[in-house]
């Protein structure tokens, strides 16, 4: 039995939206580089210099003899760094990077990035830029099938997204608890509805916001579980959720991310499941990569958040991450 509880819009009305990156071009048709700064926090961190950087650009042929042929639109997550430089200065250096892209494969298709340009202002992000990085291709590219293997490719930076980490404490991504299941427990999930306004160019505005498309995604927060072999009622779980005082915001971690902060009282069991942290971050890059790619340059706004209370999936139910399932004859074996 599923129970749904609606949060009041005051829980996200301050920082529940992200402005779009409106594409503008030079006279020759090239995109003008732009930077977008997002601050999903409450501003109670003493040091305001920590930020997460995310690059967007074009994967194109690296041919010095002719005009480059664009193959796909891609992204490069650089991670967290500490810098006092202006966003425009960071963008300028990023556009001058010589980033090589190579398509390869492991468990799934991958894209390899490495930079050949010396770093100055971007030194705090040298771990990704100088030692190279490998990403799941579908997470960082909108059309990896169009990237050739017989022609050298480069990643030309066009846009930069900076997320200021202004919240006091740590941004915890509780990965280990996301698949945790328990007998007689109630799973606490969130269903988030976004209204999306794709960046269609300057001066082009849809007058009626209701005409804009909406999309949903779901995240798992934790489980409410009693010590005895009894199950909490939905009304009791709703009361515990209300006491948590959850505040929501949208950030740019990995593209678009949902940030949650508990400003009230949290149950001891749930607090332990979340690593005793009250500031959480859920990147859509991990949750829903297709939706994340759609939101790379778009304006998006939270229009609804609902707490979804469901019975925890029984432990005897197996999670199948592989399309090959073992059979009794042993013809296929999942290693």
Swiss-Prot record:
Localization of this protein: Virion; Host cell membrane
Domain of life where this protein originates: Viruses
Keyword terms: Host cell membrane, Host membrane, Host-virus interaction, Lipid-binding, Membrane, Viral envelope protein, Viral matrix protein, Virion
InterPro entries: Matrix_C (IPR042539), Matrix_N (IPR042540), Matrix_Paramyxo_C (IPR055413), Matrix_Paramyxo_N (IPR000982)
A molecular function GO annotation: lipid binding
GO biological process per UniProt: virion assembly
Chain segments annotated as coiled-coil in the UniProt record: none
GO cellular component: host cell plasma membrane; membrane; viral envelope
Function: The M protein has a crucial role in virus assembly and interacts with the RNP complex as well as with the viral membrane. Associates with phosphatidylserine (PS) and phosphatidylinositol 4,5-bisphosphate (PIP2) at the plasma membrane. Interaction with PIP2 triggers matrix protein lattice polymerization. Matrix proteins induce host membrane deformation and curvature necessary for virion assembly/budding.
Similarity-based family: Belongs to the morbillivirus/respirovirus/rubulavirus M protein family.
Quaternary assembly: Homodimer. Dimerization is critical for virion formation. Interacts with host ANP32B.
Name of the protein in question: Matrix protein
The species this protein was found in: Measles virus (strain Ichinose-B95a) (MeV)
The organism's taxonomic lineage, starting at the top: Viruses, Riboviria, Orthornavirae, Negarnaviricota, Haploviricotina
């Amino acid at each position: 039995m599923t129970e749904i509880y609606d949060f009041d819009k005051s829980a996200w009305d301050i920082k529940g939206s992200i402005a779009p990156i409106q594409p503008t071009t030079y006279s020759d048709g090239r995109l003008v580089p732009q930077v977008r700064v997002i601050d999903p926090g409450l501003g109670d961190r003493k040091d305001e210099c920590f930020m997460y950087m995310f690059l967007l650009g074009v994967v194109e042929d690296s041919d010095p003899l002719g005009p480059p042929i664009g193959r796909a639109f891609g992204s490069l997550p650089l991670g967290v760094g500490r810098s006092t430089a202006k966003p425009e200065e960071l963008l300028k250096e990023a556009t001058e990077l010589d980033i090589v892209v190579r398509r390869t494969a492991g468990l799934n298709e991958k894209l390899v990035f490495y930079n050949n340009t010396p770093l100055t202002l971007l030194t705090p992000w040298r771990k990704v830029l100088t030692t190279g990085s490998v990403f799941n291709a579908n997470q960082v590219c909108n059309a990896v099938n169009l990237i050739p293997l017989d022609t050298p490719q480069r990643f030309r930076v066009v846009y930069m997204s900076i997320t200021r980490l202004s919240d006091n404490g740590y941004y915890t991504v509780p990965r280990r608890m996301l698949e945790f299941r328990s007998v007689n427990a109630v799973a606490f999930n969130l269903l988030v509805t976004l209204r999306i306004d794709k960046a269609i160019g300057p001066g082009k505005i849809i007058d009626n916001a209701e005409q804009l498309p909406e999309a949903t995604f779901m995240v798992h927060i934790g489980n409410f579980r009693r010590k005895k072999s009894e199950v909490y009622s939905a009304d009791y779980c709703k009361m515990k959720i209300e006491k948590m005082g959850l505040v929501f915001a949208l950030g740019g971690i990995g593209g678009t991310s949902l940030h949650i902060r508990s400003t009230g009282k949290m149950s001891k069991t749930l607090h332990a499941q979340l690593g005793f942290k009250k500031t959480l971050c859920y990147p859509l890059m991990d949750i829903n990569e297709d939706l994340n790619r759609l939101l790379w340059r778009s304006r998006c706004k939270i229009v609804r958040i609902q707490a979804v209370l469901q019975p925890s999936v029984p432990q005897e139910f197996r999670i199948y991450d592989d399309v090959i399932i073992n059979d009794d004859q042993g013809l296929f074996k999942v290693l």
